[in-house]
């Protein structure tokens, strides 16, 4: 899904439906569907936590695997809010992109963050990161 980041939010929302293919390659519909599905009370109120494993991630080239754009960071992001988890994941992807001379992905350009705020799922500006040993 063309959302800037395909992580915890996408996994919890589009991963919960059968016909997710209709949202692929839709730059506005994909993020809208992701956040609207997350906002369903039966999903949002029952979530426990989200994990984003950054031991291996792809930071460019879209949905198709491309080994040229695989990064590694020995970090697990764990959080109650999948939107916040994706926000911190995006920071890691952005660093990898910048190291390769690619355009950074800014949180304000990622529609799932904007839509999540509008739907009351959280504002990434309020997200906090705690580093645990």
Protein language model regions, located:
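Extended, low-polarity segments enriched in aliphatic/aromatic residues
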Residues: 1-133
């Amino acid at each position: 899904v063309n959302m800037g980041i395909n992580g915890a939010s996408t996994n919890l929302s589009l991963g919960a439906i059968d016909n997710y293919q209709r949202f692929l390659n839709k730059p506005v519909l994909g993020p809208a569907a992701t956040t609207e599905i997350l906002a369903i009370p039966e999903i949002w109120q029952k979530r426990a936590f989200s994990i984003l494993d950054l031991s291996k991630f792809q930071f460019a080239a879209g949905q198709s695997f491309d080994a040229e754009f695989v990064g590694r960071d020995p970090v697990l992001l764990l959080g109650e809010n999948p939107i916040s988890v994706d926000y911190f994941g995006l920071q890691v992807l952005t660093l990898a992109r910048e190291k390769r001379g690619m355009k950074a992905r800014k949180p304000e350009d990622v529609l799932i963050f904007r839509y999540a705020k509008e739907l009351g799922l959280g504002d990434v500006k309020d997200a906090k990161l705690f580093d645990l040993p």
